[in-house]
């Protein structure tokens, strides 16, 4: 019985499925070993409901009530069981719930926004050919780095150790692509390195091991360690559902779950977006679009939950006041305020809050999107390309973005919502808007807008940022107005796609 008890304990804490997986221990060690008290063997860390964890092993033959999983799957803690070494969890991709041993889990870590984190740790920038040779010592077949070309500015050089030599391959620019042999073309350096790591093609040997630039960390290794690196083989890409300045947004499936995928192919931009993706790993809230993970392939794939009913502007325009009641507008506004209150509490500034960046789920929950990417998109943009009609005067004039400038944008978003998706400042050019707002002009409330909502809008548009309310106060006032509205929030009739919307969403 003692041996059986040991097996159960090992399964509970290490997730093994069979006795064959247990480590072999010498009899001498067993005679000398005294087991610690049970309390010492129990996990000391207690995970609260909502904590995301990564599975450390595979469990394909679950007993009734247990959850099947593969190594590296993401689950969310629902509750701790009375037996403290077990949790009831929900699987991120399948949506199934079940029991899982604590020892088979490790907490999913938020990724640090570390300037040393690099998608291209093998890129050494401006170094000479001689310096590259020194870096690739001692000789090792397949050891490589990429540098900028000294002789041909704008081009790159792939340096590969082979035998006792270092071979230098000039990387040419051709019609927006990169090539070494003018036969195979790549969209960026990451794509090129990925290709030659699998197939030597026109070069001397496959790329085996990158020579990391001093002071950098591999983003791929850090993403994998923290539990955010997803497997490309499990991703199926579908139709394009949107397009931003830096790449397309595609619909897709990851292990059977519908997802939205932002594909960023420019390696410099991908590096900037990596920093903001690190921010997204820290943010977990019902009213924020959830990051599922990242795939490194020909650039960067940012995989997010798919929010089925699209952005709030189109949702309201295609239904109008005949189908969407005031209570539902208040509900959407409250959802956005609560999502922004959470970001405000984390000291994160969105910078591009607008109804186009709010997505609506199947059960009519409004979710703030692009909250982690807005800062990356601002890099490389001048003030003439800011969303003028949504941007606070101090941000337009001095580039000063704060939570208070987000509050200004929220006031414009309220105007969009209660006008059922109309463009703000109708019939005014961007120059006219900027000048008029500077002189104190504020929009009139949309037709049918409740008085208290107009008061809220006006408070968001105070010229002095300090006088604008925090999102916490905005959420409180919207919740109060929703309660006083009396009628339940509702969207009547059919959606634009022909499916029936829920008729009632209780506040």
Curated annotation (Swiss-Prot):
Compartments where found: Cytoplasm; Membrane
Keyword Repeat: no
GO cellular component, one term: plasma membrane
Biased composition range(s): Polar residues: 491-507
Active-site residues from the entry: 352 (proton acceptor)
Residues annotated for ATP binding in this entry: 241-249, 262
Residues with Phosphoserine modification: 501
Superkingdom field: Eukaryota
Name of this protein: Megakaryocyte-associated tyrosine-protein kinase
Gene, per the UniProt record: MATK
